[in-house]
Amino acid sequence: MLTLIQGKKIVNDLRSRLAFEYNGQLIKILSKNIIAVGSLRREEKMLNDVDLLIIVPEKKLLKHVLPNIRIKDFSFSVKVCGERKCVLFIEWKKNTYQLDLFTALAEEKPYAVLHFTGPVSYLIRIRAALKKKNYKLNQYGLFKNQTLVPLKITTEKELIKELGFTYRIPKKRL
């Protein structure tokens, strides 16, 4: 367990330290492509872990980011890691914390931010309402009859409004 303040400090420390190895080179992950999600974004007082969403600029890089993740000046161990999710244990100020990393492509960003911020109860209500209209919403997009529905949106707030719901800031979601 860690406090919200500790979680925010960890994220600030990580922002300039995340990179991945690709074709023998170390590629820095830009701070603007690292988004705090989960209980940290909802500003819960106590956190079980730190969740970060990494926006990957090119599809060809997606399979390389998490399996080849590097954190400058941090000691960490990998619990499990794939193309879209990686669970790490990081050493920070003499304690060990769980860090969950997720990836999304730029066009998936609004959907992924909503999905990984949650909370689950909020997402269930939205998805149930959409299901009645034969839509499926997940972290990759909005689908109707298994076909991606293109929406001209770039933010989570625009997504919520486009779906016909009232936007609530993450800490006010139930």
Curated annotation (Swiss-Prot):
Involved in ssDNA binding: annotated span: 42-51
Keywords, comma-separated and alphabetical: Disulfide bond, DNA damage, DNA repair, DNA-binding, DNA-directed DNA polymerase, Magnesium, Metal-binding, Nucleotidyltransferase, Transferase, Virion
Pfam families: DNA_pol_B_thumb (PF14791)
Domain of life: Viruses
Major location (coarse): virion
Site positions for Stabilizes dGTP in a syn conformation to overcome the Watson-Crick base pairing constraint: 115
Extra remark: Consistent with its intracellular location, ASFV encodes its own replicative DNA polymerase and three base excision repair enzymes: a class II AP endonuclease, the repair polymerase Pol X, and an ATP-dependent DNA ligase.
Protein name per the record: Repair DNA polymerase X
Native species: African swine fever virus (isolate Tick/South Africa/Pretoriuskop Pr4/1996)
